[in-house]
Amino acid sequence: MTEPDGSRTEPLGQVDALAVPRFAGLRTFARLPTLEQVERADVAVLGAPFDSAATFRAGARFGPAAIREASLLLRPYNERLEIAPFAAVQIADAGDAPASPIGVEEGHAAIEAAAGEIAGAGACVLGLGGDHSVTLPLLRAAAAAHGPLSLLQLDAHTDTWDSYFGARYTHGTVFRRAVEEGIVDGGASLQIGLRGSL
């Protein structure tokens, strides 16, 4: 936690790789503390292990675990950029939202509730998906805490279908729903990297 004078009253950053080898210990994002280990987080990493709204290939539900596994090699200092990203703000791993794989609405509700609790406590949520549909409940939680959002979307597709096989909530309908629900201001948002037909 940061005191008014700028000092910290709790550990900040990653587990020391010289004290605990990278292959050992709790699997958190970048070996950062869990949300329970810190008094307050500036950023909370939340896994959204959900892919029931994918229309082609399943498996994205394993994304949060794979990202955490790959993040074990992240270093506390980036020499090329000359920054120590984990020393500037308190980042903690909030674990995974208990998203049911059976129903899209139920899965999204669990993700939104978990993200809403974090955002309501004042932390920025960094979501790890999951299929693209997990963006909608994350955006809902952020908008509930901050009001309508401007969106910078880096993607090959717009994800603005109206429906797919009659379903209005899929990985390809996320941003249409977000604009329709008023949680994203389409006029103040930008999509970068688009290719293909949709």
Question: Model-found features: residue ranges?
Answer:
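Conserved alpha-helical scaffold segments that buttress catalytic/binding sites
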Residues: T2-L198
